[in-house]
């Protein structure tokens, strides 16, 4: 994988639906203890409870406390408090005609079971998982004061190999990896998925015509739009915060450079100049600057381009390879691919500068993408000789692995908030 990353930089970047299963590899001792009481015995009720438990585990902020009878049982708040729970979620699922009625209550086990939150919903059978994610968001926000990310989605590329043939698919799934859907399938590579700010479209690079082209695709309808198809490199699309522009990399004039494409008019403006390779642009959340990777200093490093005056400043100085950088949505950190001692890991640096800290340590990590609440980083890695996705907290204290059941998973992108 590392050799491929180097080759992709030098070149600019040069089936079956896969579901993902959560595996927690490292947690924290300060997680909030919470119990999820059974919502009932039928399939929908059990699924809701399981999804909520899984979501809160993914956040890394919660420790799940099991009742004395284990899963799929209900225990009193006082009993669960004795087992260590600070909060308790209790729910009920009923059939109302052809609809499903779901009620839930969040209680403060420390304060004698005081009710913190209670709500009732009516849904269709195909909305069970979506509602469970919504309940997780409500619980998370009530207990932490921050917006939950469980109703967001992730995009990634899955690759199925059979002999000498490969099948590439652009997938979209829930944030927990479930409910995957194929937006595109091709026998040629698909690369660099990037979400629009409203979460309705994804930009990507396609090689379906034996050359690189940049497209956008509607997540809802699958309708595609060709953005660029110049000779040479068309790569690394990234949306502006207002969704009106794409920053792209083109080699139509020779050396790969970064351009801005106005999506309404189709007009283009060149943003970087000179003889060095410039690639992997990412807008800052405030839209005032771009981070990008360039070899202008002799090795791949991260630079910042001011969109107001075109001034470029170097961001990274530690190590001889830093790339794929992006701001966290709160703009407190810059997350990047960092090479040290021939090991490729996910690194983080304060926006104001300073040392780069490794968040991962496998040496085979790439493609970091930050959650919309700035707390988690989704990335691609290798596990048991397969491409899988990992999640790490921005402080490095929580690590999870989402192993794919089949094939390889790569180039993940985390959506923005979708509502």
UniProtKB/Swiss-Prot annotation:
UniProt keyword Cell division, yes or no:
yes
**Primary site of residence:** periplasm
GO cellular component terms, alphabetically, are: periplasmic space
Task: Report keywords, A-Z.
Answer: Cell cycle, Cell division, Periplasm, Signal
The record's annotation in Pfam families points to: PD40, TolB_N
Which SUPFAM superfamilies does the annotation name? TolB, N-terminal domain, Tricorn protease N-terminal domain
Similarity field: Belongs to the TolB family.
Summarize subunit and interaction data from the UniProt record for this chain.
The Tol-Pal system is composed of five core proteins: the inner membrane proteins TolA, TolQ and TolR, the periplasmic protein TolB and the outer membrane protein Pal. They form a network linking the inner and outer membranes and the peptidoglycan layer.
Name this protein carries in UniProt? Tol-Pal system protein TolB
Q: Which organism is it from?
A: Legionella pneumophila (strain Paris)
Task: Write the lineage as a comma-separated list.
Answer: Bacteria, Pseudomonadati, Pseudomonadota, Gammaproteobacteria, Legionellales
């Amino acid at each position: 994988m590392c050799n491929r990353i180097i080759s992709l930089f030098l070149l600019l970047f040069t089936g079956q639906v896969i579901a993902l299963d959560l595996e927690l590899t490292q947690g924290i001792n300060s997680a909030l203890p919470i119990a999820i009481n059974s919502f009932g015995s039928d399939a929908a009720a059990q699924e809701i409870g399981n999804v909520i438990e899984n979501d809160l585990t993914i956040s890394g902020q919660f420790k799940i406390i099991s009742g004395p009878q284990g899963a799929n049982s209900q225990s009193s708040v006082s009993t669960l408090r004795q087992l260590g729970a600070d909060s308790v979620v209790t729910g009920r699922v009923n059939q109302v005609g052809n609809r499903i009625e779901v009620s839930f209550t969040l209680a403060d086990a420390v304060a004698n079971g005081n009710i913190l939150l209670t709500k009732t919903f009516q849904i269709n059978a195909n909305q069970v998982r979506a509602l469970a994610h919504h309940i997780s968001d409500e619980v998370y926000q009530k207990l932490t004061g921050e917006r939950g990310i469980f109703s967001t989605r992730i995009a990634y590329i899955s690759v199925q190999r059979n002999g000498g043939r490969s099948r590439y698919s652009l997938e979209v799934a829930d944030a927990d990896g479930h409910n995957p859907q194929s937006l595109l399938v091709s026998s040629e590579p698909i690369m660099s998925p990037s979400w629009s700010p409203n979460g309705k479209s994804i930009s990507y690079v396609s090689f379906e015509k034996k050359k690189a082209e940049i497209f956008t695709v509607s997540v809802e309808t699958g309708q595609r739009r060709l953005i660029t198809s110049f000779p040479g490199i068309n790569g690394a699309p990234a949306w502006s915060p207002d969704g009106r522009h794409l920053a792209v990399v083109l080699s139509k004039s020779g050396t790969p450079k970064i351009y801005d494409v106005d999506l309404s008019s189709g007009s283009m403006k060149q943003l970087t100049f000179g003889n060095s390779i410039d690639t992997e642009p990412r807008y800052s959340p405030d839209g005032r600057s771009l981070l990008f990777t360039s070899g202008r200093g002799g090795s791949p490093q991260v630079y910042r381009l001011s969109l107001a005056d075109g001034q470029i400043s170097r961001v990274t100085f530690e190590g001889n390879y830093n790339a794929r950088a992006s701001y966290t949505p709160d703009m407190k950190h810059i997350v990047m691919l960092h090479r040290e001692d021939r090991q490729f890991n996910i690194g983080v640096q304060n926006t104001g500068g300073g040392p780069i800290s490794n968040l991962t340590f496998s040496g085979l990590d790439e493609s970091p993408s930050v959650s919309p609440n700035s707390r988690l980083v989704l990335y691609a890695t290798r596990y048991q000789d397969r491409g899988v996705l990992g999640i790490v907290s921005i402080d490095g204290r929580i690590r999870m692995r989402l192993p794919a059941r089949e094939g390889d998973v790569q180039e993940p992108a985390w959506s923005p908030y979708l509502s």
